[in-house]
Regions:
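Alpha/beta hydrolase fold serine-hydrolase catalytic domain that processes acyl esters and thioesters
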Residues: 1-24, 29-108, 112-116, 120-161, ...
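Gly/Ala-rich beta-loop-alpha elbow adjacent to hydrolase catalytic centers
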Residues: 166-170, 174
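Short glycine-enriched nucleophile-adjacent loop
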Residues: 174-183
């Protein structure tokens, strides 16, 4: 079935004046934020077409072979949009990339005529980004969310029509940035695009900052959603048909579209069950308990060689369960919670 690559072929000849900016355009620009433009950032601002020449000279097919699928997909996508009349003249400006032991942050702004799209990068291969994803359950804002807000506020000083968006953690950063912005900046935001990103804690969900933002949030998840079902998000989300199975549906490359629209679908029963289980699971814990619990999860994942959604397999989840069972370093309460959590994930992965 057609995906966003097919969209670039069908609509690549159409200008934004002929076919207005839409949800699939937003996903395409969100996916491009996964690419590392550090080696060509001194050429910004510049058009997609011009930057692509330098980018593909530096980042060869050989270099991308060892990368995770999300980078390969984005690399392939960039190859399609670089000469597309619809995308090639979009300006790329203000590339930011910060990675250290405590945070992972990436953002780039795309500008076309009088509007901009701020694209936040999702979780990459660095462990600091993976760790931040877990910290969302006990902290707000995490370091990357603070950086996302600063980035948005900086761009809002220069532009008046703003879209913000991202895939996975990038979707969460888009929402978090808008939440932290003042009313003057919020008025400039047209839409906040959240493509299967984790939500926020119940405390932030119930805040005025989030509730008043809901009308501007457009969230999309696949039928089987794990990342996008974590914590609390806008209740008005769209489920998209995917041609991948299980947790791999998180890859937006698998999301099906028809024309300039995503093909709608129904949330899987396993995703609904997972969402409820995680919320129930988090309710009865203090912030300190959650911090310690996240630390324990992270240790188990590392011991089981799980560093991203792409490295998750049934064998590795079972390895997590067995590892926890054999441990004597955690108190009984933490050990019990770890077992419940990994069994929930195992049930989701096996669609039981």
């Amino acid at each position: 079935m057609p995906n966003f690559i097919d969209y670039t072929k069908y609509y690549g000849e159409k200008s934004f004046e002929e076919v207005p900016f839409n949800d699939i355009d937003a996903l395409i620009l969100a996916e491009l934020s996964y690419l590392n433009f550090s080696d060509v950032s001194d050429e910004l601002p510049n058009t997609i077409e011009n930057i692509s020449k330098s980018y593909f000279y530096v980042v060869t097919k050989e270099k991308i072979k060892s990368k995770k699928n999300v980078y390969k997909y984005a690399h392939n996508l960039f190859g399609y949009v670089k000469t597309s009349p619809r995308f090639k003249d979009i300006e790329m400006i203000n590339y930011s990339r910060i990675v250290d032991s405590k945070k992972q942050f990436g953002a780039i702004t795309f500008k076309y005529n009088d509007w901009i799209y701020i694209s936040y990068e999702g979780t990459n291969e660095y462990m600091s980004g993976w760790r931040e994803d877990f910290d969302l359950s006990n902290t707000f804002p995490v370091p990357s969310q603070k950086l996302a807000a600063e980035y948005l506020i900086g761009e809002a000083k220069k532009h008046n029509k703003i879209y913000v968006g991202g895939h996975s953690k990038g979707g969460n950063l888009a929402v978090a940035a808008a939440m932290q912005a003042d009313e003057k900046v919020r008025k400039k935001i047209i839409t906040v695009y959240d493509f299967d990103g984790p939500g926020v804690r119940e405390k932030e969900f119930n805040s005025d900052q989030f509730q008043t933002l809901i009308p501007k949030i457009k969230k999309f998840t696949p039928e089987v959603s794990v990342i996008g079902m974590i914590l609390y998000s806008t209740p008005n989300y769209t489920v998209v048909k995917s041609d991948y199975k299980g947790i791999l549906q998180h890859h937006a490359m698998s999301w099906q579209c028809f024309g300039s629209y995503f093909i709608p679908a129904k949330q899987s029963k396993s995703s609904i069950k997972f969402n409820k289980s995680i919320k129930d699971f988090l309710k009865d814990n203090t912030e300190e308990e959650l911090r310690n619990f996240v630390k324990a999860i992270f240790e188990v994942l590392q011991k089981s060689d799980i560093t991203s959604t792409e490295t998750v397999t049934i064998k590795k989840i079972i390895k997590c369960v067995n590892y926890v069972r054999q441990l004597n370093t955690y108190d009984p309460k933490t050990k019990d919670k770890l077992l419940k959590l990994f069994n929930i994930v195992l049930a989701l992965y096996t669609n039981k």
